[in-house]
From Swiss-Prot:
Membrane-protein topology: Multi-pass membrane protein
Organism: Danio rerio (Zebrafish)
GO (cellular component) term, any one: endoplasmic reticulum
UniProt keyword annotations, A-Z: Acyltransferase, Endoplasmic reticulum, Lipoprotein, Membrane, Palmitate, SH3 domain, Transferase, Transmembrane, Transmembrane helix
Protein name: Palmitoyltransferase ZDHHC6
Biological process annotations from GO: protein targeting to membrane
Catalytic activity: L-cysteinyl-[protein] + hexadecanoyl-CoA = S-hexadecanoyl-L-cysteinyl-[protein] + CoA; L-cysteinyl-[protein] + octadecanoyl-CoA = S-octadecanoyl-L-cysteinyl-[protein] + CoA
UniProt family annotation: Belongs to the DHHC palmitoyltransferase family.
Residue ranges of every copy of the SH3 domain listed in the record: 313-398
Motif window: Di-lysine motif: 409-412
Transmembrane segments: 25-45, 58-78, 144-164, 206-226
Stretches in topological domain Cytoplasmic: 1-24, 79-143, 227-412
Gene that produces this protein: zdhhc6
Length: 412
């Protein structure tokens, strides 16, 4: 009922537009091709419905399709859960432990992060997935992971059907010569008489579906193991990055701090139960979380504030000396810039001569930073940050002592 309520409720009708994106279109096409070809191959050529095994096989194929689509659409339409706009903690004094989101005009609750694609602060955000055209987060993590498990299992079943269909239909039709292999599609089969002949077109379609099924099994199966690692450690991909930076910060400044990740409850089973429950809904409200006994609700958010302050201290001021149109791979900026573009979904930003940028990290050919905006844009909560070619900027000579440490010294 979750998916039906998400679609039927008037306020959420706009969610249907998530289907009109290359990710869901490709995903649903692959599901449709593999499912339909497996069913057709079974009924027509391999395992007819007038046998017990054929009937059981047909029911299993239908069940795989239903379960895969159920979890896929729930992951898409139920969504990750969003922090309410202009949200504030119940206790006013807790504001000092939280980051403020200028776009949502509210504070970021623990474990939440702002998604550029969804344009909202997402509860326990792991990542924005293009295949569901939505974020993977608190409310849909179980659905998303179940989909990642069921899709490879269904594809393995379908792949076996494809292989056995081609084997049984081609076994008596293949002849091997010294230098060639011949397939006589007009030769009769001796096992059972199919509803229609297994033609070259049917062979090509089955072979194509087999490739899709095997590719999906490998690709989606790898994603499943990544998500299970996230769940069993109760640590999202973003939080793993924050923890890594925390250790680097402590080591770099020799602060002697002992950072403990707050959301790992010490038991894989306890971590697992935070996402998968008998009711189907995850534990918690997406705002407050069970934490390690030596931590509190704001242990991670305080660390994030420290890292944010550290990033500001290490930022370096640059002035734009060359125009840049924001292209992903700008050939006009040199071959090294073209071929060594950052492999990330983070945006590129347009540059105009005379603009000022505070760079926080970079590579040999690219830099990442925040553009200095005018007062009106700043009040409106506008923030422009992203990657740009290093050759388009030059370091300001009057850079302050606090900002003089270049990013080349320590890249993130």
């Amino acid at each position: 009922m979750n998916i039906l309520s998400a679609i039927i409720v008037f306020e959420n009708l706009h969610e249907v537009k998530r289907l009109f994106h290359w990710g869901p279109i490709i995903a649903l096409t692959v599901i449709g091709v593999c499912s339909s070809m497996a069913i057709l191959d079974s009924i027509i050529w391999y395992w007819p419905l007038d046998t017990t095994g054929g009937s059981i096989n047909f029911i299993m194929l239908i069940n795989w399709t239903v379960l895969i689509l159920y979890n896929y659409f729930n992951a898409m339409f139920v969504g990750p859960g969003y922090i309410p706009l202009e949200w504030k903690p119940e206790k006013q004094q807790d504001i000092m432990y939280l980051q403020f989101c200028r776009l949502c005009q509210g504070y970021k609750a623990p474990r939440s992060h702002h998604c550029r694609k969804c344009n909202r602060c997402v509860m326990k955000m792991d990542h924005h997935c293009p295949w569901i055209n939505n974020c993977c987060g608190h409310l849909n993590h179980a659905y998303f992971t179940s989909f990642l498990l069921l899709a490879p299992l269904g594809c393995i079943h379908a792949a076996l059907i494809f292989i056995m269909t081609m084997y049984t239909q081609l076994y008596d039709r293949i002849s091997f010569g010294w230098s060639s292999v011949k397939i006589d599609m007009s030769a009769a089969r001796h096992i059972h008489h199919p509803i229609m002949p297994f033609s070259i077109a049917a062979f090509a379609a089955t072979l194509f579906a087999l490739g899709l099924a095997l590719g999906t099994t490998i690709a989606v199966g790898m994603l499943f193991f990544i998500q299970m690692k996230v769940i069993l450690r109760n640590r999202t991909s973003i939080e793993a990055w924050i923890e890594e930076k925390a250790k680097d910060r402590i080591q770099y400044y020799q602060t002697g701090e002992d950072f403990i990740f707050p959301y790992d409850l010490g038991s894989r089973w306890e971590n697992f139960k935070q996402v998968f429950t008998w009711s189907g809904a995850p534990m918690g409200d997406g705002i407050e979380w069970p934490v390690h006994e030596k931590c509190d609700q704001y242990t991670l958010t305080i660390e994030q504030l420290k890292q944010k302050h550290d990033k500001r201290q290490r930022s370096v001021e640059y002035r734009v000396v060359e125009e840049y149109n924001g292209a992903c791979c700008p050939l006009g900026k040199g071959l090294n810039t073209f071929f060594r573009t950052p492999c990330t979904e983070e945006p590129r930003i347009k540059l105009t001569k005379g603009e000022t940028i505070f760079a926080t990290r970079g590579t040999k050919w690219w830099m990442y930073g925040d553009k200095v905006l005018n007062e009106e844009q700043a009040k409106a909560g506008v923030r422009i940050r992203g990657w740009f070619p290093r050759r388009c900027v030059e370091k300001c000579l009057y850079d302050s002592a606090n900002n003089s440490t270049s990013e080349e010294k320590k890249e993130q």
